[in-house]
């Protein structure tokens, strides 16, 4: 973070939706993207971090919404949050899955303003096939990743801490690229830590 500054995430407002890279807003400024399985609590995490109940909307059909959603901060398009499509393996036809992978990989590889990836995982079911695919893509681009282990309130504190340590051990080889924290939208646990990570990415890189 530069000079102790902080962004006001409560000012987040919807900007636009894009089906693919070509329809995204101009590649200027700085972005932080959120990715996660359809049932990992990604929308709840975004809404909690911005203190808005319905900024990010949850699809009733997991994996069907294929749009990339952009949000601006403080009516300034310099800083953006990006909600990447949720991924529901079981209910997605192969053709849709391939298209999703193509659009997402294009965004991750070619979007110059992408400064970091917030990867949302259910603390009870971390490091799924999807999560590992995302980490692999991030590793290839040397993209920093901050993992939110969501729904931490579903576990007792000791079990949640054990899950956190287990994920950190599994990702020890990537410790320079990946950081991990517990998060609960219901209890607002981990909000300050997650915001500080986004501030560091957005404010440092947008100078």
UniProtKB/Swiss-Prot annotation:
Keyword GTP-binding belongs to the record: yes
Keywords assigned: Cell cycle, Cell division, GTP-binding, Magnesium, Metal-binding, Nucleotide-binding, Septation
Cofactor: Mg(2+)
GO biological process: division septum assembly
Residues annotated for GTP binding in this entry: 36-43, 63-67, 83-86, 150-153, 182-185
Keyword Cell cycle: yes
Record-linked SUPFAM superfamilies: P-loop containing nucleoside triphosphate hydrolases
Any one GO CC term of the record: cytosol
A GO molecular-function descriptor: metal ion binding
Domain EngB-type G: start-end pairs: 28-204
Residues noted as binding Mg(2+) in the record, renumbered to the chain: 43, 65
General function of this protein: Necessary for normal cell division and for the maintenance of normal septation.
Matching PANTHER family: ENGB-TYPE G DOMAIN-CONTAINING PROTEIN (PTHR11649:SF13), MSS1/TRME-RELATED GTP-BINDING PROTEIN (PTHR11649)
Protein name: Probable GTP-binding protein EngB
């Amino acid at each position: 973070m530069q000079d102790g500054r902080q962004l006001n995430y409560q000012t987040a407002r919807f900007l636009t939706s894009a089906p693919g890279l070509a329809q995204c807003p101009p590649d200027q400024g700085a972005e932080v993207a959120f990715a996660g399985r359809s049932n990992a609590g990604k929308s709840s995490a975004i809404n909690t971090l911005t203190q808005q109940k319905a900024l990010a909307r949850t699809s009733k059909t997991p994996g069907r919404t294929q749009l990339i959603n952009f949000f601006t901060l403080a009516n300034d398009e310099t800083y953006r949050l990006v909600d990447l499509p949720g991924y529901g393996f079981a209910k997605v036809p192969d053709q849709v899955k391939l298209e999703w992978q193509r659009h997402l990989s294009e965004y991750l590889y070619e979007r110059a303003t992408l400064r970091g990836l917030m990867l949302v995982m259910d603390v009870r079911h971390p490091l799924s096939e999807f999560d590992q695919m995302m980490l692999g893509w991030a590793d290839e681009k040397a993209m920093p990743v901050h993992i939110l282990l969501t729904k931490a309130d579903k576990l007792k504190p000791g079990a949640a801490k054990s899950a956190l340590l287990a994920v950190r051990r599994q990702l020890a080889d990537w410790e320079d690229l990946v950081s991990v924290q517990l998060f609960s939208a219901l209890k607002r646990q981990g909000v300050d830590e997650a915001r500080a990570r986004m501030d560091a990415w957005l404010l440092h890189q947008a100078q």
